[in-house]
Design a protein with these regions (language model features):
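Sec-dependent bacterial lipoprotein signal peptides
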Residues: 1-16
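N-terminal leader/targeting segments and the immediate start of mature chains
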Residues: 13-58, 69, 96, 167-170
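Flexible, processing/modification-adjacent segments and terminal tails
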Residues: 27-32, 37-42, 84-136
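Hydrophobic/aromatic beta-strand elements that line small-molecule binding cavities or substrate pockets
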Residues: 49-54, 75, 137-140, 163
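An acidic-aromatic
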Residues: 52-109, 154-158
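Gly/Pro-enriched, hydrophobic low-complexity segments
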Residues: 61-66, 115-170
Length: 170
């Protein structure tokens, strides 16, 4: 009888039973409703770029740091318009005039959907969280919800995030 109890306890131990609460979309959305900064590498089609990102309650700012010929190009996205800057020039445009699969707009869509718990599901995978929306899947840190990566298969676009920092924490 002792062996059976020991084997059962050992199986429970190996199966990872814990009392840790599961992360919810509401908790993740709360984090993404705040301000944050990040660095990311994006691959879209046959191209790639490195960017810096800053999100606040008013806008999302994205600046290209690589490739060298686009370094310094930036876009600040507001609700329905954007301000594009490059080499001392600025132009305001409506966001709906940008091509649908533009990495800038995909990031805006990602952050917008991760800010609304009704727009994505959340599950655990390999010690991280997997958020799935209509057009994307994203891997989040289980510790603080920071983005690790995101994929938009329909647009052949991927983002790998580094230095992702929420201003107010989790």
């Amino acid at each position: 009888m002792r062996k059976i109890i020991f084997v059962f306890a050992f199986i429970l131990l190996l199966s990872g039973c814990s009392n840790a609460p599961e992360a919810t979309p509401q908790e993740a959305a709360k984090a993404f409703n705040g301000d944050f900064t990040a660095e990311a590498r994006t691959v879209f089609g046959d191209s790639e770029a490195e960017i810096t990102i800053a999100k606040n309650s008013m806008s999302i700012s994205i600046f290209v740091t690589y490739p060298a010929e686009l370094e310094g190009m930036g876009i600040e996205i507001f609700d329905e318009h954007a301000k594009i800057s490059y080499d001392g020039m600025e132009q305001e445009i409506k966001t709906d005039s940008l091509p649908e699969g533009t990495p800038f707009l995909l990031l805006e869509k990602l952050f917008d959907e991760l800010s609304d718990p009704e727009d994505f599901t959340l599950s655990t995978e390999n010690g991280n969280l997997l958020a799935k929306g209509e057009d994307f899947s994203a891997v989040l840190s289980a510790e603080d919800f920071s983005l690790i990566s995101a994929k938009f298969p329909a647009y052949e676009t991927e983002f790998a995030f580094s230095e992702f920092l929420f201003s107010g924490g989790k």
